[in-house]
């Protein structure tokens, strides 16, 4: 289990790409966050307290220079290389001048035939979350 302590320290608007599921960034920053995910079930699982929108990270419908921060919290690992490139280009497009891109992800050496899983013990100011993120793929 990998320990990870997160404390709120950013001001301004935050776009959380792949922010469904546990909704870690949304839990941490609340109404500052708009989380997008291309899986409605993941958005439905995310807790309340922040805005959730079904959207493809490779084709965002937000205007340019919209957000102070864009986060990818263990979400790039679910995209193929070309989609990663497109999602990062879109993130750059929607960042305000001087905005910040924040990435948390895993270096995956092999995810086939056994799945690659990173287990996290996430400490937020008001709660602790035990979770894991993983992939199975013969192409990493």
Stretches with model-predicted labels:
Residues 15, 20-59:
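Class I SAM-dependent methyltransferase SAM/SAH-binding core
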Residues 85-97:
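A short glycine-rich, Lys/Arg-flanked "PGG" loop and its adjoining helix->strand segment in the class I
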Residues 69-82:
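A short SAM/SAH-binding and catalytic strip from SAM-dependent methyltransferases
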Residues 58-70:
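A short acidic, Gly/Pro-enriched loop at the edge of an enzyme's catalytic core
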Residues 130-140:
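Short alpha-helix
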Residues 1-12:
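Conserved alpha-helix/loop element of class I SAM-dependent methyltransferases that forms part
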Residues 102-127:
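Conserved class I S-adenosyl-L-methionine
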């Amino acid at each position: 289990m990998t320990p990870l302590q997160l404390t709120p320290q950013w001001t301004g608007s935050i776009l959380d790409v792949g922010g469904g599921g546990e909704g870690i960034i949304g839990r941490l920053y609340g109404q500052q966050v708009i989380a997008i995910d291309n899986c409605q079930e993941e958005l439905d699982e995310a807790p309340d307290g922040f805005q959730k929108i079904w959207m493809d990270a490779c084709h965002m419908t937000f205007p340019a220079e919209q957000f102070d921060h864009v986060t990818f919290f263990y979400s790039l690992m679910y995209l193929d290389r070309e989609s990663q490139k497109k999602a990062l280009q879109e993130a750059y497009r929607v960042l305000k001048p001087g905005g910040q891109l924040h990435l948390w992800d895993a270096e995956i050496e092999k995810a086939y035939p056994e799945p690659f899983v990173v287990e996290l013990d996430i400490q937020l100011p008001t709660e602790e979350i035990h979770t894991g993120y993983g992939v199975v793929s013969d192409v990493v």
